[in-house]
């Protein structure tokens, strides 16, 4: 690893992940009461920590009682520094209810001001600039949230695989004292597992605790639907048609005519016409990014709560097995989760994604905003100055939208493969032990075969290829050339802004839909994993009862 790359945060690197599950500490169980009083196990709440004595190359993962996940290394393989921890904190803040309500308050105030002052030009520019800056910051947080969430889930799978390998090693040993018939998990015991899980959770639905949750669920479902995409493009084509209607050209008298001459009063496809769609899309982007960040936070909280219980059961299983075999010394095996091979193009995309999602992107953003403020006085704070920051963040946000979608498509596939591997290993162990597992606990999401779903899947695949990122770069270069030809006038900047904002909003709808599908699949997998751990815990409790543990 080069010193320069390490200084910059090692952008683009995707090293293999090595992890060893910690060995259960018998003292933290027995300190709750007499070591022979196994009923006390039910009240134990374990905060799971990785074994700090492992080699430096191992990545540690810690899960708190609230479900928050913390890792010792980031997704590029480097230990987390102050900047990484700060960005992770901002990701959590951005998805909070407080930020959600603040955004809506700002939006309402902006609407009221527009009504009072009859929606002047600068009023629209303020919304576009504000939204562009917000979108620029949110893209950084969304990218980091995607990359860190997947890195955390891969480490979770590594923890589960490491312990599962030990479980398989211990449980498949046969001893003369054991009677497999006595530890068979009955059908009614398996059915009782469902009593511990909300039926909606088994289907991957987020729990609804209040009106806010209900609003978020409905909004994400409709904004990320194929119908919303169709309505969006209908609105765009209607707007294009309205461009043929002459509108205020923004010129000052004397006019050369109503629609003729070099200084007409009215003009087709005017700057005002472009401003209308820019403002409308800016509001839509503001709402969508806020909902997306919030939905991701709620999803992480949901899965985190299940993972706390899953790790607790893993600890209990590990304790009972090791107590039976009187072995608290043998460590769990090290599990290596290999990174997927990438083409040169995808490595470049990952490099850019890491620039967005690390401190480098923040530093670049601060430098750009400082420069923009600095040139305000020489430009006399005119309309062009107001538009400059919106144009920059709009073009960058346009590229970010393509990169976000392409990266998300790949990391979800990698994440799903690891959860699928855990489910496969679980079921193989169940088969060896003669444990029956209901089909609904296999971790497979309900199949959807509607026309709308297939259409949406096709759109998602098209929008998630490296070629789509290349096309976005070509479009940006073309728009920069056009704006330069117009000397970055108001019209030139609006031309650079308008198509990028439209496509960025469309990609955000596609991304929102992709998040809905992937998050639902993950919730199905996590709840199924929870159910399988309860079944395995029941098996272990029957196979190694208290009397047998006392005798040994």
From Swiss-Prot:
Keywords, alphabetical = Ion transport, Iron, Iron transport, Isopeptide bond, Membrane, Phosphoprotein, Transmembrane, Transmembrane helix, Transport, Ubl conjugation
| TM spans (from-to) | 98-118, 226-246, 272-292, 355-375, 384-404, 466-486, 494-514
GO CC annotation, single: plasma membrane
Q: Does the keyword Cell cycle apply?
A: no
One family name in Pfam for this protein: Iron_permease
Query: According to its UniProt record, where is this protein located?
Result: Membrane
Q: Where is this cross-link: Glycyl lysine isopeptide (Lys-Gly) (interchain with G-Cter in ubiquitin)?
A: 39
Q: Which residues lie on this side of the membrane: Extracellular?
A: 1-97, 247-271, 376-383, 487-493
> What residue ranges lie in the Cytoplasmic compartment?
119-225, 293-354, 405-465, 515-552
Output the GO biological process annotations, alphabetical, semicolon-separated: copper ion import; copper ion transport; iron ion transmembrane transport; zinc ion transport
Q: Which residues carry this modification: Phosphoserine?
A: 48, 50
- Its main subcellular localisation, reduced to a broad class, is membrane
Job of this protein: Required for Fe(2+) ion low affinity uptake.
Q: Any other comment in the entry?
A: Present with 573 molecules/cell in log phase SD medium.
* Name of the molecule in the record: Low-affinity Fe(2+) transport protein
Record organism: Saccharomyces cerevisiae (strain ATCC 204508 / S288c)
Specify the taxonomic lineage: Eukaryota, Fungi, Dikarya, Ascomycota, Saccharomycotina
Q: Which gene encodes it?
A: FET4
């Amino acid at each position: 690893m080069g010193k320069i790359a390490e200084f910059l945060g090692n952008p683009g690197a995707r090293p293999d992940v090595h992890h060893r599950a910690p060995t259960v500490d018998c003292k933290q169980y027995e300190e709750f009461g007499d070591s022979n009083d196994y009923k006390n196990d039910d009240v134990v709440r374990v905060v799971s920590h990785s074994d700090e004595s492992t080699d430096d190359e191992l990545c540690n993962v810690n899960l708190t009682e609230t479900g928050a996940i913390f890792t010792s290394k980031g997704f590029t393989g480097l230990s987390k520094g102050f900047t990484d921890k700060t960005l992770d904190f901002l990701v959590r803040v951005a998805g909070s209810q407080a930020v959600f309500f603040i955004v809506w308050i700002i939006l309402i105030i902006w609407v009221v001001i527009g009504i009072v002052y009859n929606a002047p030009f600068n009023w629209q520019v303020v919304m576009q600039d504000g939204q562009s800056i917000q979108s620029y910051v949110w893209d950084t947080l969304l990218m980091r949230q995607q990359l860190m969430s997947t890195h955390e889930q891969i480490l979770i799978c590594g923890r589960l695989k490491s312990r599962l390998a030990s479980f398989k090693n211990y449980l498949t040993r046969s001893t003369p004292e054991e009677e497999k018939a006595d530890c068979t998990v009955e059908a009614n015991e398996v059915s009782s597992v469902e009593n511990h899980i909300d039926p909606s959770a088994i289907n991957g639905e987020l729990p609804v605790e209040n009106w806010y949750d209900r609003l978020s669920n409905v909004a994400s479902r409709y904004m990320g639907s194929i119908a919303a995409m169709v309505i969006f493009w209908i609105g765009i084509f209607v707007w294009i048609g309205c461009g043929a209607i002459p509108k205020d050209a923004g010129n000052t008298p004397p006019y050369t005519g109503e629609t003729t001459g070099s200084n007409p009063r009215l003009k087709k496809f005017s700057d005002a016409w472009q401003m209308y769609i820019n403002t409308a899309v800016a509001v839509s982007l503001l709402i969508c990014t806020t909902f997306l960040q919030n939905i991701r936070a709620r999803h992480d909280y949901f899965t985190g709560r299940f993972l706390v219980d899953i790790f607790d059961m893993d600890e209990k299983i590990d304790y009972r097995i090791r107590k039976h075999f009187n072995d608290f010394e043998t460590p769990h095996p090290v599990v290596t989760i290999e990174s997927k091979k990438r083409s040169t193009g995808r490595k470049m995309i990952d490099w850019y994604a890491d620039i967005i999602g690390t401190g480098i992107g923040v530093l670049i953003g601060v430098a750009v905003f400082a420069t923009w403020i600095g040139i305000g006085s020489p430009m006399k704070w005119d309309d062009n100055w107001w538009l400059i920051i919106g144009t920059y963040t709009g073009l960058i946000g346009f590229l970010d939208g393509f990169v976000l979608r392409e990266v998300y498509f790949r990391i979800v596939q990698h994440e799903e493969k690891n959860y699928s591997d855990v489910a496969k290993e679980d079921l193989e162990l169940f088969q060896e032990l003669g444990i029956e597992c209901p089909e609904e606990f296999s971790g497979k999401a309900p199949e959807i075969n509607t026309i709308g779903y297939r259409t949406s899947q096709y759109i998602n695949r098209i929008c998630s290829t490296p070629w789509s990122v290349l096309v976005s770069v070509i479009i940006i270069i073309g728009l920069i050339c056009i704006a330069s030809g117009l000397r970055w006038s108001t019209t030139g900047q609006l031309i650079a802004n308008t198509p990028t904002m439209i496509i960025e909003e469309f990609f955000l709808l596609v991304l929102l839909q992709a998040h809905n599908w992937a998050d639902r699949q993950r919730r199905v997998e996590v709840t199924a994993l929870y159910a399988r751990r309860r079944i395995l815990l029941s098996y272990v409790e029957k196979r190694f009862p208290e009397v047998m543990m006392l005798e040994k």
